[in-house]
């Protein structure tokens, strides 16, 4: 294991790494993905996405999974913009 990987492992729990690896290989939100989150990771989809959002803000995660972090960041920004648009209409 490289020094960078070892440092990353020390900063993240095994469950965090499993979650990030799962998201990296399952990027689309579907009912099947939600079922897999429940059965493979043992958490609710809501908690999964909360934790994913927390993790991708960490520099170590951005360094190890840059495409994943960028994708999640873009999705979050798009949702923020959509909510802001809705607020203007209310």
Residue spans of the language-model regions?
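Intrinsic-disorder signal
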Residues: 1-4, 90
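Amphipathic, hydrophobic secondary-structure cores in small proteins
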Residues: 18-74
């Amino acid at each position: 294991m490289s020094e960078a990987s070892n440092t990353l492992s020390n900063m993240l729990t095994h469950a965090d790494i499993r979650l990030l690896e799962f998201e990296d290989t399952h990027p689309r939100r579907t009912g099947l993905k939600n079922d897999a989150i429940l059965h493979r990771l043992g958490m609710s989809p809501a908690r999964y996405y909360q934790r994913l959002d927390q993790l991708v803000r960490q520099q170590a995660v951005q360094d190890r999974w840059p495409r994943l972090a960028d994708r999640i960041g873009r999705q979050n920004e798009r949702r923020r913009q959509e909510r802001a648009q809705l607020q203007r209409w209310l």
